[in-house]
């Protein structure tokens, strides 16, 4: 069984005095972080948490959550990371499904079925001597993260130590590493994008500037004053930052804006090019331990809309009806690599359907061009089929977002007796604009069947904690209308 030294322990040994985590309030070195984690381990040992057991973690970004995630790995327990924005019912369902033995939280939460401990209680509680894992077995499960369940009930994605290691290595081979690197972390750590930064932090020995909750003003300031070199964003965050930037630009020390969470509108990318902001578009999911494809900033304008090529250890192909498709033919995106999950917890059928001979069927639609660059069209489940024609919501959203008075746009399919489905749009506007004007604007830029049949105006669009658009909630709004 392949093993490695315990990552944080090894990092604390190699570069003990280097800053690991910085927040508004404090800075902590790798050695101090390791000591803090060992202390939390002794508290957890008193609670009888043991290797192989599953422990639910319901916490917001902060030093406490970082300590808990590392402490569980020191013990060999599996962290089941819960989304703080879920309803009580959803959280209870996931805890039961994951068979957790207890819940560690920084919130007031009282499930009936398992013991609940707040971080404060744990940290101030009794301690017990503990055997720490000095080595990690790469085949063992480290975390379980539930997919958002765009179709059916959420599924617990098992990610091993090996998956997390391969993900960090693949990213570093793509982006490179610098001594002065500082990654600004504003993505929630219960999502794989946020969690992967914790892994990179200790593997690379890289400073992480931790932002507990999404705060565009602080992030904008930090990029200018805190030596931030890399930041992970989604399109909505990038729009917020550009708004604050106005006619200015960011310092040249910012070498990478890693943009994920779905296709980005062209006008947004063009604005970034004008300002010299290096945007790396990326494609990934929970099942791939975060990114699996990335487009470097060199190709920002020549390959607008592409998510790039697979990371060095990964492979990608397009399949349709079980056959591999040539370039420029649409189909399902299928990926393979050491960062890809081995499957879903207690969901053998879903695992067998999704992962075939190591190839993960993503459920996303796309194509590769003649040079092998990936273009993600949409989620298969978001596809609108109107009169036999495939309509990708992302394409209509891009057109809507190019209108000067549109801040946000979301498109979903509505049942239609004649066509099966027709597209309708939800828009957040920045000034006076009517439904008729929006429809006319689209008619000039889109095929007739792609033009939204209705446009509804909202104050804001529903998004998850990573600021990804929640189309299923737009569908619910549509049903209520």
Curated annotation (Swiss-Prot):
Family per similarity comment: Belongs to the ATP-dependent AMP-binding enzyme family. MenE subfamily.
Protein name: 2-succinylbenzoate--CoA ligase
Alphabetized GO MF terms: ATP binding; o-succinylbenzoate-CoA ligase activity
Superkingdom of the organism of origin: Bacteria
Function: Converts 2-succinylbenzoate (OSB) to 2-succinylbenzoyl-CoA (OSB-CoA).
Pathway involvement of the protein, from the record: Quinol/quinone metabolism; 1,4-dihydroxy-2-naphthoate biosynthesis; 1,4-dihydroxy-2-naphthoate from chorismate: step 5/7; Quinol/quinone metabolism; menaquinone biosynthesis
Main enzyme class: ligase
Record keywords, A-Z: ATP-binding, Ligase, Menaquinone biosynthesis, Nucleotide-binding
The protein's Enzyme Commission number: 6.2.1.26
A Pfam family: AMP-binding
Gene Ontology biological process terms in this record: menaquinone biosynthetic process
Catalytic activity: 2-succinylbenzoate + ATP + CoA = 2-succinylbenzoyl-CoA + AMP + diphosphate
